[in-house]
Design a protein with these regions (language model features):
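Multi-pass alpha-helical transmembrane bundle typical of ion/small-solute transporters
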Residues: 1-281
């Protein structure tokens, strides 16, 4: 599919998520995720998090945007709650993916060519699951941008935000996802339509569950890495083609990169709370 078509579809879902959240939550586009993080006037040290995020993402580290950005604004109490919810998300995703792909691997060869008569169903399924996943993901991670904005955003500012977001998507699709895309592409059979559809569907359901659980922000990155971890272990268990000595280093590398991102987040929050503005939050 041409990247411009995907950009148009993604932009449509994004604009729906943005304006629906704004209308439903009284001008707050965070979907209530910032209820425990009051608005603060932007200070110079708040730029540390986006700066680190840009650097780590460019080198392919699957850093948690929620931890890195919100840690500069949240209290240590809220950060602890975010960490616990994200750890639970990682564990739930890994276990669910393992169980699901044990079953899927027994009845479906994801790498086998799709029958011509079935292709339309898988394509529709992929667009459907990806669209709902995109909306659910936005309802989680919109808070990472909304934290810099007033909790009640006026219409004129919303129009500017919408334009900036759509332009950002245009750049991202034109670049093809960048180095961070390798986290997915290096996994077993993730390029196939059936694999992508099932991954998107499972990821969507898990994120939706945690969205409805409570309004504490969480790392959607951790959930995704946990899902890929469980899937890789399941496929190695069932097929026997992937030796565990090959799978474990792959999983370990992703987990290590996650810890690098977490360490950066902790560094930001400790610097702000105990060095730059001690007792300020």
């Amino acid at each position: 599919v041409n990247w411009k078509i995907m950009w148009g579809a993604a932009s449509a879902v994004l604009l729906w998520a943005l304006w629906y959240g704004w209308y439903q939550y009284g001008g707050d586009i965070s979907y209530g995720r910032l209820n425990k993080i009051p608005f603060q006037e932007i200070q110079w040290y708040h730029a540390m998090a986006p700066g680190l995020l840009l650097i780590l993402t460019r080198v392919g580290v699957p850093v948690s945007t929620s931890f890195l950005v919100l840690s500069a604004f949240a209290s240590t109490f809220v950060l602890e709650k975010m960490l616990m919810k994200s750890m639970m998300g990682y564990a739930v995703a890994a276990v669910a993916a393992y169980v699901i792909w044990i079953g899927v691997s027994k009845i479906l060869d994801e790498a086998k060519p799709v029958k011509e008569s079935h292709k339309i169903y898988w394509r529709v399924g992929q667009w459907f699951t990806t669209g709902f996943l995109w909306w659910t993901w936005l309802s989680h991670d919109m808070a990472n941008i909304a934290v810099f904005l007033p909790r009640e955003i006026p219409v004129d500012m919303m129009l500017i935000i919408s334009a900036v977001f759509v332009f950002g998507l245009w750049y991202m699709f034109r670049e093809g996802g960048g180095k961070i895309q390798n986290i997915v592409l290096e996994k077993h059979n993730t390029r196939y339509v059936r694999s992508a559809t099932i991954i998107d569907g499972v990821y969507w359901i898990i994120l939706f569950f945690f969205k409805e659980l409570n309004d504490i922000p969480m790392s959607t990155t951790w959930v995704f890495v946990g899902l890929l971890c469980g899937r890789e272990l399941a496929m190695a268990t069932v097929t026997g083609k992937e030796k565990f000595k090959v799978v474990f280093p792959l999983i370990g590398k992703d987990f290590l990169k996650m810890m690098v991102g977490l360490a950066a987040s902790v560094g930001v929050v400790l610097s702000i709370h105990y060095i730059i503005v001690p007792n300020g939050l």
